């Protein structure tokens, strides 16, 4: 892509593969969240009507859970290098009040800030916990009754934590930080957004746009 086209259309934030995988994980999680409420909480049983009925939900929930886990493992492999914490992340954490108050940090942030990395690792841990605790619920014969009850309790607790994290993630991506969503729908963000929220990454992308086209996460110091 030419320098002028890069400036006119915005900066490539996420590749097509990244976007497809992100939305696959997001949509499978949304199904798991809704079906999880239906299965686990009697007052939410009305959700069955929107999800194909109780028998269908109980059949699909663990299968979609496996699909979600596979997608998240692929996402972990894809973004692992970008999600490693560094000195800038510690500085970002110290400047957290400014970020919460203004939606912007004074730290020279790269492609992902410490908050995004923190949420990513939170999702990795809780996703793994949901898969592990979900197995005894899918195959009750794997463990004794007492362990099954513990797995069920942990599954519920981790599920609620994950839902809370998901709500915060959606809020920050839409209401708190306008201009973020286009990066995950069309792949591009404005140059102003990139320079304001991820200045270090923005400078690297600006430099790279003059040369051979590179993947959005390929520019690392």
Could you say what each language-model-derived stretch is?
Residues 1-221:
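Membrane-embedded alpha-helical bundles that constitute the cytochrome b-like, heme-associated redox core
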């Amino acid at each position: 892509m030419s320098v002028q086209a890069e400036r006119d259309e915005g900066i490539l934030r996420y590749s097509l593969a990244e976007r497809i995988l992100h939305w696959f994980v997001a949509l499978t999680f949304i199904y798991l969240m809704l079906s999880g409420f239906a299965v686990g909480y009697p007052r939410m049983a009305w959700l069955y009507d929107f999800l194909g009925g109780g028998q269908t939900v109980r059949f699909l929930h663990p299968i979609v859970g496996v699909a979600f886990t596979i997608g998240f493992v692929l996402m972990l492999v894809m973004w692992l290098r970008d999600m490693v914490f560094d000195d800038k992340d510690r500085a970002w954490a110290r400047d957290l009040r400014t970020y919460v108050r203004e939606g912007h940090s004074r730290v020279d942030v790269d492609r992902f800030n410490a908050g995004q990395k923190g949420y990513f690792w939170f999702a990795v841990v809780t996703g793994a916990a949901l898969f592990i605790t979900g197995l005894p619920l899918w195959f009750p014969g794997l463990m004794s009754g007492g362990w099954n009850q513990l797995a069920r309790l942990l599954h519920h607790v981790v599920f609620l934590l994950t839902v809370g994290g998901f709500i915060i993630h959606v809020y920050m991506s839409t209401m708190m930080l306008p201009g973020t969503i286009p990066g995950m729908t069309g792949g591009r963000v404005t140059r102003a957004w990139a320079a304001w929220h991820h200045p270090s990454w923005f400078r690297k992308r600006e430099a790279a746009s003059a040369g051979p086209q590179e993947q959005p996460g390929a520019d690392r110091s």
